[in-house]
Amino acid sequence: MQVLHVCSEMFPLLKTGGLADVIGALPAAQIADGVDARVLLPAFPDIRRGIPDAQVVTRRDTFAGRITLLFGHYNGVGIYLIDAPHLYDRPGSPYHDTNLFAYTDNVLRFALLGWVGCEMACGLDPFWRPDVVHAHDWHAGLAPAYLAARGRPAKSVFTVHNLAYQGMFYAHHMDDIQLPWSFYNMHGLEFNGQISFLKAGLYYADHITAVSPTYAREITEPQFAYGMEGLLRQRHQEGRLSGVLNGVDEKIWSPETDLLLAARYTRDSLEEKAENKRQLQIAMGLKVDDKAPLFAVVSRLTSQKGLDLVLEALPGLLEQGGQLALLGAGDPVLQEGFLAAAAEHPGQVGVQIGYHEAFSHRIMGGADVILVPSRFEPCGLTQLYGLKYGTLPLVRRTGGLADTVSDSSLENLADGIASGFVFEDSNAWSLLRAIRRAFVLWSRPSLWRFVQRQAMAMDFSWQVAAKSYRELYYRLK
């Protein structure tokens, strides 16, 4: 079984979000599971630098100009690169300029990605041809459409990491991207009078996966589907929509081997975690106090992530004796709100605006509770890292958060399945009730340790996801 992942980023070469973490780990897990998985990426500068030994496979003239297809390896995974400097050799973000305006030629830049994904199934590399083209998010959404236009030379899977980003472009670009105009209708890639790369993936793929079972159900409902609910409900009824949970890359995220921590630990040596907490309190300007539960946020600061609720609930958290450490950036209003809280409560609130991968490990190793109060969350990786590190996740019941965290209710404690704290309604009062439950459990150290051990014993490895995808691919053959 030969599988080509078509996507726009891959950790650690280039990362703007969780998609990169998935592509950085899933193909390697699939190779270990017996699938010949490779990755197709645009040759953005950071990616090109990370694979300096890439060799020329072929050169082609395309609707988007002259391209060179390269092939190399990264961490044991075969990587194809679309080398087209006129499209991809730009500093900063792969999607927008320094003023945060989307590049005006994104329609060509990402149509080309989908086109090359299709051409790989038609023999672009004469020595390797995928049985399945697995496209990820809107950037690769045209791959299933091009495959459909070419008579489906390979099966296609389209994974939705976040339905909110839809890749919308003016209809006149149909000529530029060289897809048949017959594809431009409601039973195709047309959406609200424009081309939607996301809808192309949803409509033309042989199977759609979402990154959690709950999110796969949620996106058939209007409040989560951004207008795609009709199509997604139809795909669900046809048995062509399912959810596969993302995993944790244990080579990077494991408290037992994480060299970014002051002290490494396992579920059998949790007392070592205390040194990480002490170091984190010092680094964030918090009072060094092992008796105060340390709550943490590592997130984009947006309303989608529910960070306005954290700001609203913060006085209640602090009144009960808790501390907050926050690492993130985003909405200027939220940034100012958290910075003001840090100034008002020195020693209790520590804030770092920005994102630093290494420091996020230190927070995960040192905090007691990781807050993930998202309004919607397709899968979420932060809570999985929290479980792995014995940093109990406090989450809202939505998407992948609902699939991965079990509330520390009396019943779940008795059944030995409690792993964190879960609240239902997206408001500060509901969040505060969950915070209150966390304080109650914190007051019972032996019970807290029991839940930590339960959380750390859960298996969200990529091997589980790789097996699920392998079974899906074989069903499609």
From Swiss-Prot:
UniProt-listed InterPro entries: Glyco_trans_1, GS/SS, Starch_synth_cat_dom
Disulfide bond positions: none
UniProt-listed Enzyme Commission number(s): 2.4.1.21
Binding residues annotated for ADP-alpha-D-glucose, in chain numbering: K15
Keyword annotations: Glycogen biosynthesis, Glycosyltransferase, Transferase
UniProt pathway annotation: Glycan biosynthesis; glycogen biosynthesis
Catalyzed reaction equations: [(1->4)-alpha-D-glucosyl](n) + ADP-alpha-D-glucose = [(1->4)-alpha-D-glucosyl](n+1) + ADP + H(+)
GO molecular function, one term: alpha-1,4-glucan glucosyltransferase (UDP-glucose donor) activity
A GO biological-process term: glycogen biosynthetic process
GO cellular component: cytosol
Enzyme class: transferase
Transmembrane region(s): none
Family to which this protein belongs: Belongs to the glycosyltransferase 1 family. Bacterial/plant glycogen synthase subfamily.
Function recorded in the entry: Synthesizes alpha-1,4-glucan chains using ADP-glucose.
Name of the protein described by the UniProt record: Glycogen synthase
Gene name of the record: glgA
